[in-house]
Amino acid sequence: MAIEPFGDLLRTPGSAGLGAVVRAEKSPYIDGGTRYDMLPLYLYEGERLFLHGGRAGIKLLKQDDDRVDLFVEQRFEGFSADKIGPALAGMAPRTTGLDLGISWSSKRDWGTVQAELLRDISTASHGTEARVAYGYPLRSGRLALQPNITLSARDASLNDYYFGVRPGEATATRPAYAPGSGLNATVGLYGSYDLSERWRLLAGVSRTRFDRGIRNSPIVRDGAQTSVYLGAAYDFGAYKNAWASNRSPTYVKVLHGNASDSDCILVKIVTLRCTSTKDVGGTSINGIQIGKPFIEKLNGWPLDFVGYLALVRQNEKGFQPNGYRVDAFMKAYYTGLPWNARVQTRLGLGVGVSLAQRAPYDEVASQAARGRPTSRLLNYLDPSIDFSVGDVLGSAALKDTFLGVGCRIARGSSARRSCWAA
């Protein structure tokens, strides 16, 4: 796997961008077909913080052309229970993971060198990977290209999880197998084309040759793995660093939510067409979210971006032990509604990831009915609407106090929905 194929799109410090890339990747598994992933590109290049698509982190050191980062990144590997061929029948799915990593990069006239160390923190594989990469940026007019080569040293835990066969999964034609540690090599070519001052077309292709231990696995097909990328991104330009400003507000949100049926969406809640939650087995959550603004009044529009960290307690109503989860997400707020001069109202949409102490009960029950495994790592959407309590009551002291409702629509191995008030 290449290191951040589109991680250098923002050229101006303090800038932000938004886009998406479709990745088509030939599965390494026998009868695995082609996997398609829609990869959202949330881009932000702050003084200390950054977002590079599926990677978010902190700049520990930034000196001229040398940089050290601490980051988290989602690992897109494995196969799900509903997308397996005959060669994988009867095997437990191999799920995507979440890695914690540290990286070093150095830009020189002769190219860019990067090294990083990653460790799974989602307990999917418990694996570790070390990568080193070299790229040479080329530019001609609106076209920017970067050929790249990456070497990835993977430990036995990582390879055994994604490419091994456990003893309980062995059959007459699929013996138990553990590939052990190994070294993969990836070559790639990635590029962007400036359609305008702000819009960029993105494309890339890479090819990975697996270590011999992986290639000899009874579930891995012959040949290298090819990936193709195609997408677009919009560069909003540079903005004052709202996060670091002395006047930057801190958002504190206290919430309570109950699990709801799949058709109880935000629109129905607001219009009072869904005023109750699950009658049977409905679990609940209580939590606190802390947020800081990343961008205020984007492009002069009534649109703010706020980054949040949250600690949430899962109340499982006796079905299983209660637990905690940590959420990290970016949320956009639209404040341009026609009545906002009288009562400030915000429409919000958040996108993020959640790592739970144990898989939530709703996830466990839903997946058990389908005969599928659960996941502690969930991606989710967070739509909401809230209003200023001070504007409603005519109190200037409560002007910045908001009350609202929302839904947390999570998807790990399945979809689950919790609706909350805050």
Model-derived regions: residue spans:
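Transmembrane beta-strands of outer-membrane beta-barrel pores
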Residues: 22-28, 46-48, 72-78, 108-110, ...
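Outer-membrane beta-barrel transmembrane domain signature
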Residues: 121-214, 219-222, 294-296, 303, ...
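Transmembrane beta-barrel domains of outer membrane proteins
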Residues: 9, 21-23, 43-45, 59-61, ...
